[in-house]
Protein backbone atom coordinates (compact mmCIF):
# COMPACT_ATOMS: atom_id res chain seq x y z
CA UNK A 1 0.00 0.00 0.00
CA UNK A 2 2.84 2.38 0.83
CA UNK A 3 4.43 1.64 -2.51
CA UNK A 4 1.20 2.59 -4.29
CA UNK A 5 1.08 5.94 -2.46
CA UNK A 6 4.72 6.60 -3.28
CA UNK A 7 4.09 5.85 -6.95
CA UNK A 8 1.04 8.12 -6.93
CA UNK A 9 3.02 10.97 -5.36
CA UNK A 10 5.81 10.58 -7.93
CA UNK A 11 3.34 10.74 -10.81
CA UNK A 12 1.67 13.76 -9.24
CA UNK A 13 5.01 15.52 -8.77
CA UNK A 14 5.98 14.94 -12.41
CA UNK A 15 2.63 16.19 -13.66
CA UNK A 16 2.88 19.35 -11.55
CA UNK A 17 6.52 19.95 -12.52
CA UNK A 18 5.58 21.39 -15.88
CA UNK A 19 5.79 25.01 -16.91
CA UNK A 20 3.27 26.66 -19.20
CA UNK A 21 4.90 28.35 -22.20
CA UNK A 22 2.71 30.79 -24.10
CA UNK A 23 4.03 29.78 -27.53
CA UNK A 24 1.40 27.99 -29.66
CA UNK A 25 1.94 24.34 -30.51
CA UNK A 26 -0.49 24.00 -33.40
CA UNK A 27 0.88 21.25 -35.59
CA UNK A 28 2.50 19.20 -32.86
CA UNK A 29 4.68 19.29 -29.79
CA UNK A 30 7.86 19.57 -31.94
CA UNK A 31 7.07 23.29 -32.35
CA UNK A 32 7.64 23.71 -28.61
CA UNK A 33 11.27 22.57 -28.65
CA UNK A 34 12.77 25.99 -29.37
CA UNK A 35 10.60 27.97 -26.89
CA UNK A 36 11.38 25.43 -24.17
CA UNK A 37 15.11 25.58 -24.91
CA UNK A 38 15.06 29.39 -24.77
CA UNK A 39 13.62 29.18 -21.28
CA UNK A 40 16.17 26.48 -20.38
CA UNK A 41 13.54 23.81 -19.87
CA UNK A 42 13.73 20.16 -20.77
CA UNK A 43 12.00 18.87 -23.86
CA UNK A 44 8.28 19.61 -24.02
CA UNK A 45 5.89 17.06 -22.64
CA UNK A 46 2.61 17.95 -24.31
CA UNK A 47 0.38 20.62 -25.74
CA UNK A 48 -2.41 21.84 -23.46
CA UNK A 49 -5.13 24.02 -24.97
CA UNK A 50 -2.90 24.71 -27.97
CA UNK A 51 0.01 25.94 -25.84
CA UNK A 52 3.33 24.34 -24.95
CA UNK A 53 4.15 22.85 -21.59
CA UNK A 54 7.73 22.00 -20.66
CA UNK A 55 9.28 19.99 -17.88
CA UNK A 56 11.06 22.13 -15.34
CA UNK A 57 14.80 21.98 -15.94
CA UNK A 58 17.75 22.54 -13.64
CA UNK A 59 17.42 26.30 -14.05
CA UNK A 60 13.67 26.18 -13.31
CA UNK A 61 12.88 27.40 -16.81
CA UNK A 62 14.58 30.75 -16.27
CA UNK A 63 14.34 33.06 -19.25
CA UNK A 64 17.66 32.98 -21.07
CA UNK A 65 19.49 36.11 -22.14
CA UNK A 66 19.26 35.33 -25.87
From Swiss-Prot:
Cellular compartments per GO CC: extracellular region
Highest taxon in the source lineage: Eukaryota
Keyword list, A-Z: Disulfide bond, Secreted, Signal
Signal sequence annotation: 1-17
SUPFAM superfamilies, sorted: Scorpion toxin-like (SSF57095)
Modifications after synthesis and translation: Contains 4 disulfide bonds.
Keyword Secreted set for record: yes
Tissue occurrence: Expressed by the venom gland.
Keyword Nucleus in record: no
InterPro entries xref list: Scorpion_toxin-like_sf (IPR036574)
Localization per record: Secreted
This protein's domain notes: Has the structural arrangement of an alpha-helix connected to antiparallel beta-sheets by disulfide bonds (CS-alpha/beta).
Similarity comment text for this entry: Belongs to the short scorpion toxin superfamily. Potassium channel inhibitor family. Alpha-KTx 27 subfamily.
Protein name: Potassium channel toxin alpha-KTx 27.3
Natural source organism: Lychas mucronatus (Chinese swimming scorpion)
